């Protein structure tokens, strides 16, 4: 699949249900095309009507072209259908995105069209991967009506060409709540640009996280609110009217609901504040009044409330820190970490208050605070070959240990060690792993004989933060999947990582989206790279480690390191 297509393949079918509510179209019926479904601020495109005397192949081509209508509307496409087919065609259930149209096959009155470089999304807009060869062939039945060919049977899908998506859809996030209610969790989608953007975001948010995410995330929005009654943006205020019942919502749930809306709607640059009503009645939120700012809810930040972008490293076995700017010195941290302890692979929590490191023989873990009175202790873990640890915002320290049977996944919470079985990860040859700060995503690199794989699993927890189970690991697509040898991985956002591989004297960086939609963001460095240092915090630079240098592959920024420095990392 071409990477340009892959970038936008998570586009949502949310608009389709709105687009479907248009006048029925028959062969000679006059349609009202002056009330488009989405007022997009782009050059309008009004596809032409079926040409008199058009062949079956030309009718199918016109039908597919009509789905490029701008502003978005399915009314144009329905003109190519018979009256009955136009009434029954239900494209909202599936969205197909294709790179190019392949060959036509015609055996009157049927036309088959092959979609090349195609992928699909389900009715919720969830990326489901590429289409199998058999699924990429669309069959259309045609009949003559009043002497003209019209489509009598068409696939129930919105079939969209990739360039149209590149212009009209933007990657966005919906924000839900992890089970403890302390942190928001972003779920990536693509939403149509333009005046309907806020409505689409709220509609998507109200659709909920889905049954497959039960135990991973939840929503604090009121039950019964499957669709917004209305979303109107006036003078920077988004007036959101929902259906539903708030009688079971205490102060904490109301705050979470406001945070979900604020974080989701702040992506719309036209929205500054939100005014919420339920069935037309104003909702007064504790501490906010009858409206609240889109910058509200900072306490639920997926990256943590005290997240910094300082760098940490080991220097002679002692922990040091620096802002990472040119000329800024590396200084020892406070407490016992300022002394040498013969450790490797250090990890600092998101608050910058506690660190953990693997012992030099990789069988144990040292943990301790970074305050002046910080003391070091040993985590309740005895391993064989422990990998670099990872923290989440709850204070869980995640570990992977490897022995002859493969990988074991566990976390340390206080004085407890808890094992977590992750199908597709446990027992495999894990070489690198990451856990998202919100504690809902586990990413691993699994080494193979000819190539490595990158997989992601979602972690399920109780309301008290106990991890219960994990979903089966899902393979994440990569353009070099057949030959990829991953040197390292790191966060670039709460929903994306970067994977680096060394190809000769060139380091190749590939962004990987954790929703499974491939990404086209790809860049290189003409250096030998041994690791990558990244953070989900937007203001953090991405660094590659090369000798005694940190190299920014995006800005070509070069930070020289002291020769006795190792294990450079961000916190979190």
Predicted regions, residues:
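Bimodal "functional hotspot" detector
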Residues: 6-8, 13, 17-572
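Positively charged n-region of N-terminal signal peptides that target proteins for export
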Residues: 1-4
